[in-house]
C-alpha cells in the first residue's frame, strides 16, 4: 500500500508541474497577442534579415515611430484631418477621414506603408523635400510638402500623382499613393506629391522643377513625363499640364510640357491650345463632378487637335481611385497605353 501511495503522490506532483507550465505559456501568449496581431515579421534577403510588417491593426503611432519614415512619416496621412496616433490603419482608411471618397481599401493602406518601409529598409530613398531648408525657414508651411517615391526603372519617365481633397486636405493614401505604386509595375517612376492645400499649384510647379533638375541624380528621364490627379488633384494636373501655365508658374522655358495629363472625377472646364493630351474618367453617379462636363471639355480639346480619351463608368460615385473591384477596374492599363502613345 505504501508503494502505491508513493506513486500516486509522484503522479500528482507531475500533474501540478505540467499545469503550472501550461498556465505560464498561456499567459505569455495572451500578453503578446495584441502586439503580434499589429505587427508581423518576414525574412528579407539572403542574410535572413527581418522586417517587421504593419497590419490593419497597426496604429498610426507605430508607423510614425518607425525609423524608416524618419521625420516625414506624418505626411503619409492627411495633416489637415483629425488623424490621431491611436487610430489603427483600418480606422484611418475610411471616408470619415477621406471625405468625398469611395471604394477605400484598408488593405491597400497596409500594402503601401509596407512597400515604402521595405524600400527604405533596403537602403532606397523614399521621400524628397521639394523646398530648400532656407525656404522652409522662411515659410514653415512648406515643411509639410514633398514627394514620396515608390520606385521604377532607371532612365524611364516619371509620373507625378496628385491626390484630391477639395483643396482642404491631401487624400494621398487613397488617391495618389496607390497610383504611384501601381505605375511601378510598368517600369515607370512613380512619385506622389504632398502639397499645401492653400498653395497647391505652386507646390506642383516646384515638384516638376525638382524632378526635372535632379533627373540625372534620380536616374529618371526628364522627358515624356505625365501628370495625374483626382478631383482637386486633377485640376492641378491639367493646369500644370498646360504649357503656358507651366512656364508662368515655374518662371522657366526650359522644362518640357507633360506628355500626358490623366484626370479623374473633376468639373474642371478650362481649355486652350496649350493643353496636354488628356485621358479622363468619371462615374455616372458622381454628385461632385459631372461626367457631362468632363466629356464636353475633352470634346473641345479634340476640336483643337489635342489627343484625348474619355471613359465614364455606370453607377460609380466620386473618388473611386484605382477602381479595384468595380466596373472601372482596368482603367489604369488604358491610361498607361494612352500615355505611351503620346511619348516622343
Q: Residue ranges of each PLM-predicted region?
A:
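Short beta-strand/loop motif that positions the catalytic acidic residue
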Residues: 280-282, 286
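Short alpha-helix in the alpha/beta-hydrolase fold that links the catalytic acid
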Residues: 276, 290-300
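Short beta-strand element of the alpha/beta-hydrolase
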Residues: 156-165
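N-terminal targeting or regulatory segments adjacent to alpha/beta-hydrolase or S9 domains
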Residues: 21-144
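Short amphipathic alpha-helix adjacent to the substrate-entry channel of hydrolases
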Residues: 172-190
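C-terminal catalytic histidine-bearing segment of alpha/beta-hydrolase fold enzymes
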Residues: 43-73, 304-344
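Primarily recognizes the serine-hydrolase "nucleophile elbow" in alpha/beta-hydrolase
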Residues: 206-275
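The serine-hydrolase catalytic nucleophile loop
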Residues: 169-177, 195-196, 291-294
